Amino acid sequence: MKTKTRRLLSLLNFCVLTLLACGNSDGAGEDSGVPYLAKKGEPVDGVRIGWDYGTIRQLATRGGYPRSIRLQDNTVVAVYENYDTGYEMRCSTDEGSTWGDPVILFPIHSITNDKGTARINIANSEIIQLANGDLLAACNYRPQTPEITPFAIAVRRSTDNGVTWSDPQIIYEAEPRFSDGCWEPSFLQLPNGEVQVYFANEGPYTHSNEQEISMMTSVDNGKTWGGYKTVCFRAGSRDGMPVSKVVGDEIVCVIEDCGFVTFKPYTVRTKLSDNWSSPVLADSPNRAMALGEPVEDWIYMGAPYLGVLPTGETLLSYQVDDIRHDDQLGDRLPYSTMEVAIGDKNARNFVRCTRPFPVPAGKHAVWPSVAVWDANTIAALATSNYQGGTEAPFFMKGHVMRDLEVNSSDIVNYPIFIGHTGICNLRLGVGKDADNLYITCKVKDGELYSGGQGTQKGSGVFIYLDTKNECLKEPAEGVYKVWCSYKGDITVWQGNKGKWENSELEGLQITPSVVPGGYELAFTIPLNRSFNKDTMRLCATLSTKTYTETLVHSNADWSCTWMKMNLGGH
């Protein structure tokens, strides 16, 4: 028996060794005779957001619920709740680097009537500039003592760019108790000039815990307001926190839908021509999950906000808690952070999520919003305690990046941005002519450091090129990686059957220069005959003394995730 067993084991070992000698399981081994086929992936094309750590600013000592807009004169405005004073507004004329003194638009105050005295707290700051230049500001009046005065939506107007304001005008009142209040106003102006205010409303449901989204209309730029209509309602639930935008020929309203285990961002929509003629109920085809990928029920996603880029793509911000806790149905706010997703030009399929603020475990960034300042600049705003124990409104800029259109050898713009991890950042621009590709990197790095020649560590940049636009999920022929330190130390690799191997890039020239606050690298890359003359893919990694950071949504080994470069051919 033992002899037979040994013979059987010997036979099995022989078979295994024979199989191994014949090559790997996919038949792509060197000796298999089968050509190597690199793994391909889906290209990551379109909009990316590069958050700028160096632009983080705290807007007040204590407070929250920040929102922002850019005015027609290019001034940037931020509004927020100050927990000590009320609703404040600050302005910036240098793109958010510095902010003027705060102006109180809605002060915390008291109301006394025959039922008693109640302190009126101010919440849910919002602001809009209308097409005619007027400013409208809105907030939520929240009486601290019940049964004295109603919860309400209040509005003020300015016709001189915020220098002076009308007296507060209460446009809607709910009930005088927290369980039957109204909340979270937000503005929208339609192409025909009609101004709308959306808000969450418990007023119609005093005998249940239900809530709807209501909307009121002004046809005279906010001077007077009509009655409200119901935008959406899920029976037995609480649609909340509405923000609406015009998207194509539709009005799209993003809400937190509470009809699940935990909140989720949903969209409800109507044609502009229909303008909410009937409510969007739970089973309506006009109600849909906003995110483009499935989300598990236990993950909390609340407080959504919607933005639309001038080029049509859409942005969705919300607060998310995706960490398991002992009490999954308890208060999720202490664990939540801000997230931003990118949607298509129909405000659907929001994907490519990023988290702007550096929030550690045990801290939070909540009640967020995303503001579109222009085609290339957005702002993330949130209430956070990430710098200490006190909640405060914070602001951070983001750079909107798109597929590159390269048609000239002159590099005048630097659209690629890397700088989310820390104070160092990289701005990268590309040019080309009939013979060469030109890449210039401008790096802000206040502590230049060299790990030594040949180490590829310290202050420097990795550049990645998929010269054939193969969109691969591994390094392969025609895909290059180039390292250059701030001193000009250079290493080149080329992909080979799933690995990086030391190589050369014929004719490559790199000119380094140290400048105040950092350094610059100028790459000249000859356009080899094997290169795709119309389209390539590009990626970069910024290296510093203490960390590295790769272009957002990119994997340094997967060229399918790199940014598309349209070169226009020859």
List where the protein language model places each region:
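Bacterial N-terminal signal peptides that target proteins for export
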Residues: 2-12
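C-terminal motif of bacterial Sec signal peptides marking the signal peptidase cleavage site
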Residues: 19-21
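Short amphipathic, basic-aromatic surface patches that mediate peripheral association
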Residues: 444-452
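Glycine-aromatic-enriched beta-strand/loop faces of beta-sandwich-type recognition domains
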Residues: 476-516
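Asp-box/BNR beta-propeller blade signature and adjacent active/binding-site loops
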Residues: 33-403
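Bacterial lipoprotein signal-peptidase II cleavage site
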Residues: 23-30
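Short, well-ordered beta-strand segments enriched in hydrophobic/aromatic residues
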Residues: 436-445, 519-525
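Acidic/polar low-complexity flexible segments
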Residues: 405-409, 416, 455-491, 529-570
